[in-house]
Structure formats: C-alpha cells, structure tokens
C-alpha cells in the first residue's frame, strides 16, 4: 500500500448526539481542537465548506446545523489534509463522541 499524500483529503462523517446540537461552546471547542494540528481542517454540510480553525466560520456552521436540526438532519463531515490529518480527525471525533464535554 502506498502512503497517502499529505495533499489528499481524509474525511470523517459525524453524527451529533448532544441534545443542544452545535452552539457557541461546541463551536469554540471544535476550533480549539482543530487548531492543535498542522492539518487544514474543514467542516462540510450542504453548500458550506468552512474552516474548523475559524471561530467565525464555526459559528456560521453551527447556525446552519441548528436550522437543519429541526429536520432531524444532524450529520456532517470533517475533512482534513496535511501531515497530521488523521490525528486531527480522530481528536475531533472523540470531542463529538464526548458531546464536547458539556453533558
């Protein structure tokens, strides 16, 4: 098997399970977690493809997810590329699984 280029995107499908969906505190924790890694990390849903390292982008993303929550549509994708892309996605997956440490 050949190694994956650091320019290739790695994706992780995420399903929100916390009762309040995304709001300011989870958005902030996403930014804090993603910012620990060199990889470019993005949150993708519908027409949005936003930086997971930008609090303004994550607030916009959270607002979009809240609007989708009324339709029981709580899935989105984190994608990353760079030298530690897989580690960044693993950390974000753990963060979501732990419900952002808020429940």
What function would you assign to each model-found segment?
Residues 1-11:
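SAM-dependent methyltransferases
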Residues 11-19, 75-79:
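Non-catalytic helical/linker scaffolds that mediate oligomerization, partner binding
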Residues 15-66, 71:
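Compact, glycine-rich, soluble single-domain proteins
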Residues 8, 27-29, 86:
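Residue-level detector of functional hotspots within protein domains
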Residues 66-103:
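C-terminal structural segments of small proteins and small subunits
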